[in-house]
Amino acid sequence: MLNALTVDVEDWYHTNGLNIPQSEWRNLPSTVYPSTMKLLDLFDEFQVKATFFVLGDAAQNFPLLVKEIVKRGHEIGSHGMNHQLVYCQSMEEFKKDFMASISILERITGQKIRLYRAPSWSISRDRLNVLSLLEENGIHYDSSLQPFKTPLSGLSGIPVEPFNPVVEGKQLKLIEFPPTVMRISENFSFPFAGGFYLRFFPYSIVSYLLKKINKVRPGMVYIHPWEINPEIPRWKTNWMIHFIQYFRLRSTEQKLKRLLSEFDFGPIGEVLKYQEVMWSDI
């Protein structure tokens, strides 16, 4: 079973939980270039391709990094412009943010951008109409709907496998690929395959659950470049955010290497090329 390997190309200070004002970003040390290059070298080592959801701000600051991702044969998607939460934006603000990121990425890559992932999975129930906007502007694959609730985002009860959304009675051709979870009940799903959850759980649990998932559907692993850099700056914040942001950063690289050696991975477009998907009213 081919699983999707995805990277959210953003810097440590873009994280919504840290809540660092955008006006301060330029005064902070960036780690996105060396960390992303490290991931690219790692993927070359294991001969695997991935989908890189690139934040417009990161692309604007490091256009050569985006070119290098393309040069090495990986798939490019948009992660928005400035890592603003979708549910905190009006439709006009969202469209402006989204189109700005698309313009930058298409100018750098010379390619049409067909994939999108919202910052922090932040498309909420009252913002589902942005999926129609994405489709109208050329997006074929979206990965923004998190099938479990957190204080920051998420939608309980939505499909856990790739699906075609039905929004306000309209069947979309866009395919939604949610982050991989193990569904325990209709209203409870167990995340394990990316970000903090990948760092939190022992590798044995991650591997066991992904194997179970692969009996019925493809999984998706997601990672941020800063997660393989245990030396990122420590921002002063409350204990919970500090725990989520910095817990077991030193474990990420080894876990990722084990996953790449044990499972088959590819970019989202390749994974979904032959995947049958269902319609689902969300």
What is the predicted function of each stretch?
Residues 1-72:
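Active-site beta->alpha N-cap acidic-glycine motif
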Residues 36-40, 63-67, 95-103, 131, ...:
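Generic structural signal for well-ordered alpha-helices
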Residues 8, 43, 52, 79, ...:
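Conserved, mostly hydrophobic/aromatic
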